[in-house]
Amino acid sequence: MPARPTPPAVPLALALAAALAAPAPAAAARVKELADVVGVRENALYGYGLVVGLAGTGDSERVLFTQQSVAGMLGRLGIRIDPKDVRSRNVAAVMVTARLPPFARPGTRIDVAVASMGNARSLAGGLLLVTPLSGGDGKVYAVGQGPVQVAGYDAGAGGAELRKNTPTSGRVAGGATVERAVDFALGQAPLVLALRRPDLTTASRVAAAVNAKLGAGTARAVDPAAVELSPPPARKDDAVGFLAEVELLEVEADQRARVVVSERTGTVVAGDGVRLRPVAVAHGGLQVRVQRDPAVSQPAPFGAGRTVEATRDRAAAAEGAGGVVALPAAASVKDLARALDLLGATPRDLVAVLEAIRAAGALDADLEVLE
């Protein structure tokens, strides 16, 4: 098994400065940034087509389906030709895809993406011929055609080749015309908000905000991912206005504490609220200790304050028989990273330490390891 590439030695303080900065106060977001209305979504379209007008950079005669497609197209135009006789390299077979926006009406123009299927070297300068675009149900919803725009090139001579980006794929701006609308009537089906990041607390807050603004019983959190809406009788025939008012409501979204690490690159991203329980870790020559001490804040005699119980978190790190580095009181991933940074550790060391801390049950957060 080949060894994984070693990431560059980047100081932890620099690698984690943005991700582990001091948490900012939670900000409210509009409902339209947190959820989508069920049924109001884009639909994927696809089709098979031909790009012509290529300057010798199209498919070769070894691509049989391109030869058959050209012969079939010419046959529909009344020109009979054997597919084996098609030897032009000015044509390329392509897959054409597009996204049909919600509520798109016939006549609306949308962009399409084009990608080569054969061994064409470049689609630059090509023209996409009329291509029906179908949905998952097999019905044609749009028709694409137009000049292909490619953000790259492929040139070569004498065995040398120069390539930039991917010239075998491109776009046709406004290249498809919608011919059929998706059958969906807003207001006829039950109105449900689908949270983009399912969370019990966020769903409950959205329902509470809607009920506070539009009346009790207007919204109900069904589960962590869905909030069911019941418009008041006076708004039954005004689904658009009702949903527009709901979308503008501001809600403070909640989320689980999470740490995302990449073993391949040594990247560590920690969200707000990530905390470590008291734990001691030894990783190779590194030793890290996190502990929690009880503390009591006692007001002055005859003062107006009150006694408050708290905890004082401390973390320290050492390497071999070296000295100990003390950290401020706050057992967080930020403090752990700073302790390792002072010892010259790499981001990959932090990844390994976090995985061990999670396994020991001392990480109060979800740890997601990217491959």
Swiss-Prot record:
Gene behind the chain: flgI
Protein name: Flagellar P-ring protein
Iron among keywords: no
Role description: Assembles around the rod to form the L-ring and probably protects the motor/basal body from shearing forces during rotation.
UniProt KW keywords: Bacterial flagellum, Periplasm, Signal
Subunit structure, as described in the record: The basal body constitutes a major portion of the flagellar organelle and consists of four rings (L,P,S, and M) mounted on a central rod.
Species assigned in the record: Anaeromyxobacter dehalogenans (strain 2CP-C)
Subcellular location: Periplasm; Bacterial flagellum basal body
One Pfam family from the record: FlgI
Main subcellular localisation: periplasm
